[in-house]
Amino acid sequence: KVSGKVVKSNQPINFLGSVDKKTGAITDQKHDLFGKKIAGSILVFPNGVGSSVGAYTIYSLKSNNSAPAAMACQKADLTVASGCALANIPLFILSPDEYDNMKDGDEVSLG
């Protein structure tokens, strides 16, 4: 079981190109989470996109103590699934209703 504050995006996340692996900040100016830090959060997003090398970004986030406490998405792609497995970050797959009911800033427990 894992608890934390929801940081929710309605856009897919490219971990390789959009996340600072040292700070956990979203660096893509076009992303709806631009400037937010994901460290310690329950990161809620539709799915991951981009290079499979993004899995190593997720691992680096964990190594730098900048990773989310858990990730929750509607569809687990290979990058997110393998990154979470490498970094030992809980990954939850949400139904459309569960995803819609998650609000940015909510305190939630999953698991």
What are these regions (language model features)?
Residues 1-2, 6-111:
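Feature captures the catalytic cores and cofactor-binding loops of soluble hydro-lyases/lyases
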